[in-house]
Amino acid sequence: MSKKTSTIPTYGRYPELDRVRFPADMRNLSVDQLKQLADELRSETVDAVSTTGGHLGASLGVVELTVALHAVFNTPDDRIIWDVGHQAYPHKILTGRRDRIRTLRQPEGLSGFTRRAESEYDPFGAAHSSTSISAGLGMAVAHHLRAEEDPSYHERNVIAVIGDGSISAGMAYEAMNNAAVAGPGANRLIVVLNDNEMSIAPPVGSMSDYLSRLMSSRQFFSLRDLAGKVAKRLPGKIERTAKRAEEYARGMITGGTLFEELGFYYVGPVNGHDMSQLVPILRNLRDADDQGPILLHIITEKGRGYKPAEAAGDKYHAVSKFNVVTGEQKKAPAGPPSYTSIFSRELMRRAKTDDKLITITAAMPSGTGLNAFAKAYPDRFFDVGIAEQHAVTFAAGIASEGLRPFCAIYSTFLQRAYDQVVHDVALQNLPVRFAIDRAGLVGADGATHAGAFDLNYLCCLPNMVVMAPSDEVELLHATATACEYDAGPIAFRYPRGNGIGLDLPEKGEVLEIGKGRIVREARRAPNARGGVAILSLGPRMHESLRAADQLAAQGVPVTVADARFAKPIDKALVEDLARQHEVFITIEEGAIGGFSSLVVQHLAETGLLDKVKFRPMALPDRYIDHNTQDAQYEDAGLTAPHIVRTAADALGVEVAQQSA
């Protein structure tokens, strides 16, 4: 047993899978052998994810497709792009990473998404949806241009695998629309539409399978081309009628009219779990010449082949560690309620007496805590799908007519709608409420899902109010404040995970806009100046108080303040802290250039910056990889010991560090 295989606990259990280190090892396998390989790959995926947690359901749904793609196409020269990347676990196992698959989403382990730096078989990084067709088209065009310049360079096939949810986003259609006019480079682009909701096409049957195989064959390509040439020789009106009749007939049979109108040659629907159908169809598409971009529509079942996943309502979309035999997921120890649930609770309470409250989310009703609102007030809840741009402008339209929309979106996904936030909301000063979940560092999903930039891109906008509650009680207050604020747009950001365990009041209080609070006052002689001021924005408050305890224990007076608002800043509070302390520290769970920049700007304008040692603490200027949230903040330098060290260095004193 080699060093590589010795790290695979299931090695020896799966004979076909054990023979495959890389896709080249499967290119000579028969269809029956590929079927066996798919069965073993599915079992290996279940076993691996049971030890790590992750996105299981999507991966189980594309096992046969993954095997077929790598068996038919010459990867990594041919490029396979997995949209989002939730479904890429089987792909990772087949591409030289089986020995590390049980490090998935673990510290220093494999990413939960595709990642260029991880493997040459990951030609394009992913984690956000609907990017695959644009990237794939770019690659296909680049290959064609390189081949034109260098006759020895062979064009490659580019396959973009996108789900029926992701293809609902506008970017996917922008890419398809462009593919039709992108020139001959687009001829090597194949889009595989993975439809696991059966939302587009009728059920798969033997006739559909037959037609799909027929339509992907060279004979059908040639026949269709001949028909087109004949039609062009007919008088104009007859030609148009013939073309419409042909498209109508194909649309009646296949449901592909929309994609044909966008310039794609449509094949499908195909049973995505039938290897005997997938392999010959993919071979036909691989060998097709000059047909333009192609869309292959496959029908799959999320969670396929693992009974607990098939029976679950969410098809085990995202799971924690679980028992392979029973499917029972390991529950985290009971703790305080999550920030998401606390936001939901206050919003639900307010909605009982305010029928103007409207909620909007972009395909994340459960993740944003709006599923309860959707059940209680279905007429006031809107899930717009993976369409953040539309969600924001839709909310702006609602706000323009006097209602109170809450747009609940993860911080990392709100980035996709920035122009709409600027142009459609802030510029018009419309009172849209942005509930920004997953702000800051988020743990196992890593840099692609970190909410690191919202403070930067929101605080620079005129008319925008931005709140960052420091704990669960403050989140109640922030939600209540947003409900009552009608003067313009307002946003509040809160982290992934649970609160710190504070007792919650029955309802949130409406805060004064732009006013912070002193949480702990420095102990020193009256009118004396000195010590350290820590102005914390958001959940770093707990670490700030820990740091204050350590500093105070060694004779350093410390004032800790809660900014509450990133914009507008509490100018009076900022000025008082600067005047009364030798060192002024700001700390935030956001990138450089956010809240601290507003504070230092005001200090500079008032001349107070010349009289205080100002030290901003923010996320470093790099992306922070997947890990636990605590480990990520340790890596970022935003824990109590880091605050103590920053204060001591500014004071020019030695301060002993206390253990956590």
UniProtKB/Swiss-Prot annotation:
Its EC number is 2.2.1.7. NCBIfam families: dxs (TIGR00204), PRK05444.2-2 (NF003933). Catalyzes the acyloin condensation reaction between C atoms 2 and 3 of pyruvate and glyceraldehyde 3-phosphate to yield 1-deoxy-D-xylulose-5-phosphate (DXP). PANTHER family: 1-D-DEOXYXYLULOSE 5-PHOSPHATE SYNTHASE-RELATED, 1-DEOXY-D-XYLULOSE-5-PHOSPHATE SYNTHASE, CHLOROPLASTIC. One of its GO terms (molecular function) is thiamine pyrophosphate binding. Coiled coil: none annotated. Homodimer. InterPro entries: Dxylulose-5-P_synthase, THDP-binding, Transketo_C/PFOR_II, Transketolase-like_Pyr-bd, Transketolase_C, Transketolase_CS. The lineage of its organism: Bacteria, Pseudomonadati, Pseudomonadota, Alphaproteobacteria, Acetobacterales. It comes from Gluconobacter oxydans (strain 621H) (Gluconobacter suboxydans). This is 1-deoxy-D-xylulose-5-phosphate synthase.
